[in-house]
Amino acid sequence: SEXASQNYSFQAEVAQ
């Protein structure tokens, strides 16, 4: 999302 990870945050946000 913001500063997490452009790869992990993408799946993390969509999953949540």
Swiss-Prot record:
Q: What is its induction?
A: By heat shock and primary alcohols.
Report one GO cellular component. Answer: cytoplasm
Q: Which GO terms describe its molecular function?
A: ATP binding
Q: Its domain of life? A: Bacteria
Main localization of the protein described in the UniProt heading: cytoplasm
Localization: Cytoplasm
Q: Which UniProt keywords apply?
A: ATP-binding, Chaperone, Cytoplasm, Nucleotide-binding, Stress response
Question: What does the sequence similarity comment in the record state about its family?
Answer: Belongs to the heat shock protein 90 family.
Whom does it interact with, and what assembly results?
Homodimer.
Q: What does this protein do?
A: Molecular chaperone. Has ATPase activity.
Name of the protein in question: Chaperone protein HtpG
Organism of this sequence: Acinetobacter calcoaceticus
